Amino acid sequence: MNATIFALLLLLNLAMHNAAEQSSETDMDDTLLIPEINRGRCIEEGKWCPKKAPCCGRLECKGPSPKQKKCTRP
């Protein structure tokens, strides 16, 4: 009885492992690069820059303290 349960669990584990490997294979055409994901949600020049969204274009998040950072030109 225990051997049967062990064999069934082993087969289930192998089946789940194979399914996970097949689902992790992605095509580069189906994936978005990080700049493309944030394209519509970037922070403009002079606006406060939180950690969640990057500054637009070549702007950098600068300021005297972490709470006072704004998107500015480098």
Swiss-Prot record:
Residues 20-39 form a propeptide. GO terms for molecular function: ion channel regulator activity; toxin activity. GO terms for cellular component: extracellular region. Disulfide bonds join C42-C56, C49-C61, C55-C71. Keywords: Disulfide bond, Ion channel impairing toxin, Knottin, Secreted, Signal, Toxin. Its main location: secreted. It is found in: Secreted. Expressed by the venom gland. The presence of a 'disulfide through disulfide knot' structurally defines this protein as a knottin. Probable ion channel inhibitor. This is U4-theraphotoxin-Cg1a. The lineage of its organism: Eukaryota, Metazoa, Ecdysozoa, Arthropoda, Chelicerata.
